[in-house]
Amino acid sequence: QDGKAAAKPVLLAVSFGTSYNNNRNVSIGAIESALREAYPNYEVRRAFTSQIIIDVLDKRDGIDIDNVTEAMDRLVADGVKEVVVQPTHVIPGFEYDDVVKEVSKYNDKFDSLKIGRPLLVDDGDYTDLIGVLTKETARYNVAGTALVFMGHGTEHEANATYGKLQDCLLYTS
């Protein structure tokens, strides 16, 4: 014990990122705000997985955002002992796999290191999401109106998640 106060536990919100400033505030920023509210004993920090987005924001706007490695190194340097990494990914695809691989290198650097799951992993996740989507889009449930939900797709096997979600939505309609 060197007399320093223990660093507050950190919840690292990891997303692909976006170079659109307004969109970032209402999407990624909203998720981070919800995390702060839900976990007030944690400091919420941000990391992006897209180095291209990070570089654009730095060059264009002077905004400095860590990639996952930089964020993890900073947590070690700051003396943080407890870390929860929560990706904002929808499916467990390549981006999520990369986050898990990178973060796992730091297992021995913290007293506690946990990695959260993407939005859609098991059957209950689909049920929960469909419940939210149904409630939040109820006002559009009128004759002649169609709702289209889009995912970016991937060559990863997790792409099947989108088909499963579609099947679940059709089954519950």
Residue spans of the language-model regions?
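Glycine-rich, highly charged phosphate/nucleotide-binding loops
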Residues: 61-74
